[in-house]
Amino acid sequence: MMPIKVEIVSPEKVLFSRAVDMALIPGLEGDIAAMPDHAPMMLLLRGGVVELHQDGAVTDRFFVAGGFADMTETSCTILADQATALSDLSVEAAQARLAELEASYDKADKMNVPVLDLLMAKMQSARAEIEAAGGPAVQGA
């Protein structure tokens, strides 16, 4: 099988740039596999783990906090709001971020739907980060 060129880019830097057999990506509506000859598409991302596969094994894992992916027949570029290697995640930092977001949600104007939606998306991402870092699964409100 021909490889697919994958790039994972955060606002700070390029975290990954290499050809792999497949990238499993956390899409907003479910996970999707980016593989060679995939139909071109743009994909909104939810907070979750990107798994990179080579020779039948997972070689690299990154947490993305959202963003989007641009998939073509030969490449996949992931532009993440935040991206971190799984080995660099901290359960405690993600739990603290979730607590801050929950406090902000509690104080937010319940009539301001765009702000509430943004806070809900960030809380979902923080919950996914806690789980990706090896912490307990956290149920959302």
UniProtKB/Swiss-Prot annotation:
Keywords: ATP synthesis, Cell inner membrane, Cell membrane, CF(1), Hydrogen ion transport, Ion transport, Membrane, Transport. Disulfide bonds: none annotated. Its main location: membrane. GO terms for cellular component: plasma membrane; proton-transporting ATP synthase complex. It holds the Pfam family ATP-synt_DE_N. It is a peripheral membrane protein. One of its GO terms (molecular function) is ATP binding. It is found in: Cell inner membrane. Gene3D superfamilies: F0F1 ATP synthase delta/epsilon subunit, N-terminal (2.60.15.10). It comes from the Bacteria. F-type ATPases have 2 components, CF(1) - the catalytic core - and CF(0) - the membrane proton channel. CF(1) has five subunits: alpha(3), beta(3), gamma(1), delta(1), epsilon(1). CF(0) has three main subunits: a, b and c. HAMAP family: ATP_synth_epsil_bac. PANTHER family: ATP SYNTHASE DELTA/EPSILON CHAIN, ATP SYNTHASE EPSILON CHAIN, CHLOROPLASTIC. Belongs to the ATPase epsilon chain family. Produces ATP from ADP in the presence of a proton gradient across the membrane. This is ATP synthase epsilon chain.
